[in-house]
Amino acid sequence: MRRPVPHATALGAVFVVLLTVPAQAAPFPWAPPPVNMCGETGFDPLYREPDPAAPPAPVAAPTIDIPIPVPQLIPVPMPDPPPDNTRVAQAPLPSDPCRNPCPDVRDSPGPAAETVASAQGSTGSASAVPRIQIRPEYEPMPFPVPGGEGEPPQAAPVPVKPPVDPGPLGAAVAPPGLESVRLVEQVTGHGSRNRTDMRWQVDGTDLGLFWETEPGRVAMVFGDTFGAGWVYGGAGADTADWRSNTLAYSTDRVLDDGIDIEAMVQDSPCHAAELLGSRKIKNWETTTIPTSGFALGDRQFLSYMSVNHWSKVPGMWLTNYGGLAYSDDGGQTWTKDQHARWENLFGVGRFQVAAMVPHGEYVYMFGTPNGRIGVIGLARVRADDVLNKTAYQYWVDGNWVPAAEYSATPLVHGIASELSVRFDAESGRWQMVYLDPAVGQIVLRTAAEPQGRWTETVPLVSTQDYPRAYGGFIHPWSTARDLYFTVSAWDSYNVYLMHARLDPR
């Protein structure tokens, strides 16, 4: 979650882990930060000892922060404005990876401009006398006012009444053994091989959700994204070229050395476009965050959540609804479906953060409530009816039941956060990865059927080793033995590729 700050910010990027590094966690030995092929310094998300050659950080006087709530009336023109679908085709990247494609937009920083993450503190001498800071904390109070015409209404799908079908548990399977897990490389941001800051004005972003858009090509969608003005320490300010989401493409099949991003959806040269617009108004709609993607034929789909506001309680947020959007031009422009929405009545909606997976005749929807203290529910719908909410069947006590989204039986014991689910055709097993905030681990479960029986968890990444890591989004070209997935790290606010070597059983 975004931490409270003393100025108006985007409050972007959902997913900061609930747990900080435990006091007993031993740091790894210091190592110099990674450097890409252009000599640009990147980020190391691993918990390490400080640089022994660095001078000790100055000690700052303690501060007592006293926020004073100040209501702020915010008029919100309604209905929502139509999306800006301005798009610019991606030009081929330069053959020299260190040459920027748009030096007029942003050129490479000189050596003096290079920045490396470091501890920050006061430059004055230490003092035992605390500094008292009283500051206004503006709390938006949005109210609707008449606006423009907005989007034309969409025809509602014809309501259907699917039957109650049996959905017995599958056979129990053994969890895979874990041979190793390693950090492959930094995918986004300054110092990455993809140089997304120079090529697409993506300095800070998170998530990195994958799906295969067509044979041989994957899409990679990111959450709240920031450009010029972003600084190390979490998500950026609302003035730092904030976009609620962005989309990249890759055909790179050799993942053991990283993933190459070849193009992004652009609204101007070298500038990644926002796909799903948001009002960017706290307590109305702060942002729209993709939660999964999939393709049915030539149509691309995104599940997403409309975030009302981030809570001051770590790991909590309130959504307006979870919804579906689709694209018929390969992901360049998107339409939010006005009817395929799961409203968050009284904050107890079960399918606010959804991971959707086509398999056979159905699309399966794994869902959790807003925040990260909820349980996992499951639904399915025939692929032809994916935009018809009345056609969904929810898994309840061993049956597929229509109109039962609030009654869905939990798939596993315990809480989960931001799911990623994949069916591995070679092994015939389902793979599910998510952050378990109760133990501070990104974990893997497997099953023979989407409704389970799901195995016990296999720990993949610990937040003791990768402080405030979150995510765990599976690359679709993973296998039963080689699981590639992305994680995000809050402080460096960028995406990293991980590789787990598994021993299927």
Q: Regions from the language model: what does each represent?
A:
Residues G233-D257, M316-Q332, G377-D384, L444-P450, ...:
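Beta-propeller blade signature
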Residues P27, R199-W200, Q451-S478:
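Conserved blade-ending motifs and adjacent loop-strand segments that build the rim/top face
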Residues G472-R505:
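Blade-level signature of beta-propeller repeat domains, shared across WD40, Kelch, NHL, RCC1
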